[in-house]
Amino acid sequence: MRRNRVDVITLGCSKNLVDSEVLMRQFLSNGYTVHHDPASVCGEIVVVNTCGFIGDAQEESVNTILEMVEAKKAGRIGSLYVMGCLSERFREDLKKEIPEVDAYYGKFDWKQLISHLGKSYYAEAENRRKLTTPRHYAYLKISEGCDRSCSYCAIPIITGRHRSRPMEDLVEEVRMLVKHGTREFQLIAQDLTFYGLDLYGANRLAELTARLSDIKGVEWLRLHYAYPAQFPLDLLPVMRERPNVCKYLDMALQHISDPMLGRMRRRITKAETYELIERIRTEVPGIHLRTTLMTGHPGETERDFEELLQFVRDIRFERLGAFTYSHESGTYCDKNYQDDIPESVKQERLGELMAVQERISAAHNEAKIGSRLHVVIDRAEDGFYVGRTEYDSPEVDPEVLIPFVSGQELNPGRFYMAEVTGAEPFDLYARIVD
């Protein structure tokens, strides 16, 4: 155990990662050294920032807490604190089941944790995060919470109502990060497309995106977690006309069959979904769409699932992720539906869905062979420089693998022109041409 050291372990999504970065800055401001590597935890203070979204994430969080309890018993770490979404939802249960943890805090209880340690909370440090990502890219959380009421989702229970961050704060944070070398920003939120309604009485996502793209030094802005219902169409000209706004949109659709969209309380129809996708692709030529789909929601029939498969074949998404339904306490589903789809059927449908997408992804990537794309280098690994195009977000999307060449050194964080020389379903191979 090392004195004056804090280890923060982050589980779950990029929004959770931003929360950890805010907390780490508070520890730094109080004179601690901070670390964010779960493989080398040995601090006198350990904070596990948990995820509580679905069953698998909850299980991972509990297992991580138990691992840290064992490390504490063995004397490898000092005090152990748990915060985040799982603790927000199930704090009292966790206290009973794992009492060895020194204290449990909710998702937004940074001040209470710092106060518990007898330290000062520095409000001015809230917009000066300690980045855990490579310096050249960062996640920018533009809002917190969600006002939607999807049947399956526990996020509004955990995070509360939607709360936009003031636009001036976001502009200032990006300017500051650019000064320290950040060039790429992933705009994230539980619901990106609700931005501004609470603060300004109108959707201001297009204006925010334009203002951020005007900041000198911003190379790429990428938009994550849009909601299809009431999509702000004024965003599309901004994406089309501004070179540093990536031709990329992450918009979770979940399903396509009208009966399922109704049961999910998505407030959009099949016809409206097709129309929106056509509008986006028409107004922003070359855009890459990423979506998330779900299998096994209560009431999903074979006909519903076949409709979903056909939708994926029709639209041919450039990027797609999927997961199985998880029956979460406190949700509309929990109160109104039975979890009536066997887990084996959920998994079988998930596998079939992803097999269809793998073939589509392979075709998309093969079509890129011979093309030239701007690539940012993230790291060197196993004989390759590993990078991404504007169509690829960190961690979740394909990567570009560029073999080492004698006499050629590529720098992480630099942008290069590359020619695609080969393709796999979820990766590209390339060579530098500039």
From Swiss-Prot:
It comes from the Bacteria. [4Fe-4S] cluster 1 binds at C13, C51, C85. Keywords: 4Fe-4S, Cytoplasm, Iron, Iron-sulfur, Metal-binding, S-adenosyl-L-methionine, Transferase. This is Ribosomal protein uS12 methylthiotransferase RimO. CDD domains: Radical_SAM. It comes from Porphyromonas gingivalis (strain ATCC BAA-308 / W83). GO terms for molecular function: 4 iron, 4 sulfur cluster binding; aspartic acid methylthiotransferase activity; metal ion binding; protein methylthiotransferase activity. HAMAP family: MTTase_RimO (MF_01865). The gene is rimO.
